[in-house]
UniProtKB/Swiss-Prot annotation:
Disulfide bonds: none
SUPFAM superfamilies per UniProt: N-terminal domain of the delta subunit of the F1F0-ATP synthase
Transmembrane feature ranges: none
Superkingdom of the organism of origin: Bacteria
Major localisation: membrane
Protein name: ATP synthase subunit delta
Length: 184
């Protein structure tokens, strides 16, 4: 099984446990707790090595995860999930599991993630209007991340999954160029 398949399997299991209505913890809270743990793991090479090394006994790893969970005030559900990762030697895959978990929860809760590139910084009213248009196109609530790409000349490009909505001047010029070259 590939690493991404493994990450998806663990992420699905966590999503099942923290789904709205079936858990005392909200999915967003679980995600934040896991991010906090991931940040602690990334901040210390020694900690990362201790939790990922096969030579460190699982009992010690669990004790370390327990202490960090106490310090970060991590809920029992997320703590138990971290214990499962330690027990199955998957703690090194936490970043990929987190990414999969975010995508799974977005899908289950009716959200879509959009990467928006524009020629200049968009104003708040422009962002709101763009969000409303994308929500109407996709039928989902939109979570947007913005970037400026001056090469677009003007307009914007939105990427949602594998779908690209190109409203840039550069894209229009490229389309015009293709049409003109095929008409020759």
């Amino acid at each position: 099984m590939t690493l991404s398949a493994v990450a998806t399997r663990y992420a699905n299991a966590l999503a099942d446990v923290v789904s709205p209505g079936s858990s005392p913890i909200r999915p967003e809270a679980a995600l934040e707790e896991l991010r906090a743990f991931e940040a602690a793991l990334k901040s210390s090479v020694e900690l990362h090595n201790a939790l990922t090394s096969p030579s460190v006994p699982v009992g010690r790893k669990r004790a370390v995860v327990g202490r960090i969970s106490d310090t970060l005030k991590i809920s029992p559900i997320v703590r138990n999930f971290l214990f499962v990762l330690v027990d199955h030697r998957r703690i090194a895959s936490l970043t990929e599991i987190l990414h999969s978990f975010e995508l799974i929860m977005d899908e289950r809760l009716g959200f879509a993630r959009a990467e928006i590139s524009s020629a200049r910084e968009l104003t708040e009213p422009q962002r709101t209007a763009l969000s409303a248009q994308l929500a109407q196109l996709t039928g989902k609530q939109i979570r947007m991340r913005f970037a400026v790409d001056e090469a677009l000349i003007g307009g914007a490009v939105a990427r949602i999954g594998s779908t690209v909505y190109d409203g840039s001047v550069r894209g229009q010029l490229q389309t015009l160029e293709r049409r003109l070259s095929t008409e020759r």
